[in-house]
Amino acid sequence: MSASPLKVAVTGAAGQIGYSLLFRLASGSLLGPDRPIELRLLEIEPALQALEGVVMELDDCAFPLLSGVEIGSDPQKIFDGVSLALLVGARPRGAGMERSDLLEANGAIFTAQGKALNAVAADDVRVGVTGNPANTNALIAMTNAPDIPRERFSALTRLDHNRAISQLAAKTGAAVTDIKKMTIWGNHSATQYPDLFHAEVAGKNAAEVVNDQAWIEDEFIPTVAKRGAAIIDARGASSAASAASATIDAARDWLLGTPADDWVSMAVVSDGSYGVPEGLISSFPVTTKGGNWTIVSGLEIDEFSRGRIDKSTAELADERSAVTELGLI
């Protein structure tokens, strides 16, 4: 184990997702049993004492791969030299808050973090945004980090992707490992479009295996799109462990690559593919290799799918307009 440690920053590190995420990172879930990890943990001042308690627990695990932990509230210090930044912390929507209020509150956070990453992160940095509204938070951070290539920013739609795989597996009786080429299009919101028309179940077209358009429209899509709300209703708190697991999955596949016979969903900056307006951070089917992603090309988009994609990307365009008017980008 002679490899130099990967410096990984996690924001909102004392939060619920952070609590699930840090122990997975430290145990080797990201890059396997041979690559040490150095954790750089960012929190707001009032949460630093709680974060110290989490670090005590990390110490008590005696993880062989955890080479060091640094905590603080200054992104300029915490992001210094990091090669992977997982931006988990975000202002949750409170009672009486409009979506514009949420965008404004998070805008200040992601503006500051984008500028700090631009100033001090490693040249090879990759930035994954989990904190919601993730797509537009990623857009704000990206815009405020002009020296970092735009393709180094991604927002998390892997949780939606994993949810879609799970629902399709349950419907068809297949193992989750039998399902390939699932796609999430658009925003990480209730307008997202989980698309199984290109997916495969044990090598066969998923839509043909299901053979039930009503189930696709009335059950599959809304169940995936509204799963977060269903978990809040059941658990009394938002999904945290599953979001952390998806954050690991997304970062691992980004850094290590996707299998030859599969793709994943990532929200990345649009180049105009599939009619998604250029510059929006929207979810696409992508393959990854060597730390770089490529949008899967040449997929046929039928009229039903077109309408769903357009609805979600219109929401993203509205969010972009809102943060532009707020002077955040």
From Swiss-Prot:
* Biological process according to GO: carbohydrate metabolic process; malate metabolic process; NADH metabolic process; oxaloacetate metabolic process; tricarboxylic acid cycle
* Entry binding sites for substrate: R93, R99, N132, R163
Q: Where is the active site?
A: H188
Q: Which GO terms describe its cellular component?
A: cytosol; peptidoglycan-based cell wall; plasma membrane
* Keyword Oxidoreductase appears in the UniProt entry: yes
Give TM regions. none
Quick one: which residues bind NAD(+)? G12, A13, A14, G15, Q16, I17, G18, N106, Q113, T130, G131, N132
Q: Which NCBIfam families match?
A: MalateDH-SF1, PRK05442.1
Job description of the protein = Catalyzes the reversible oxidation of malate to oxaloacetate.
Similarity remark: Belongs to the LDH/MDH superfamily. MDH type 2 family.
Q: What is this protein called?
A: Malate dehydrogenase
Its gene is mdh
